[in-house]
């Protein structure tokens, strides 16, 4: 549902329309209720009509739940720009150990750099990077003390003239999955990269 809510906020183009299919006969009522909250238009009786329950911000707020960190994760704290290069090397060493592909390793280093740089620039403090394996993915997590006020940052294409949100946009483009939690106590972003299936660790 979070993905559905974000799409409508990102693709605000009257010339673009998509049709999402839901089996109203068999799906639970709560799933159908969320579908009405995350879709501005509903197809009923052969025609489209506005959804009176449309409330994507409410759904995003409900999906904004704390994310668990693996207690066995390896960590690296970035306190300034001088720590970025060592952080990339740290990420590369762990990626090689768990079997991430060469292309995936390059993506991981870029993701770790962009997440840490974003924390340094906008959170006003250090960034704690953590890495661990989750099933067939490598997770790169960034935690800081800042608060992400715009949930669409990183999903909208950044302005050609500006640099704000460009890093998070790249993270979302390179990772297989990005999860975010933000509150007054700080922000956590987790980026998932698929491991090389040819190697079993």
Describe every region a protein language model picked out:
Residues 66-68, 117-201:
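Conserved beta-strand-loop-beta-strand hairpin that lines the nucleotide-binding pocket
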Residues 3, 112, 164-167:
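Amphipathic coiled-coil/heptad-repeat helices and related helical stalk/stem segments
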Residues 1-73, 85, 101-103:
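Non-catalytic regulatory/interaction regions at protein termini and inter-domain linkers
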Residues 81, 85, 89-113, 162:
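Conserved short strand/loop->alpha-helix "switch" segment adjacent to the catalytic nucleotide/phosphoryl-transfer site
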Residues 7, 91, 115, 142:
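Aromatic/hydrophobic pocket-lining residues that form π-stacking "cages" and hydrophobic walls in ligand
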Residues 76-80, 157-160:
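HAMP-domain connector/hinge
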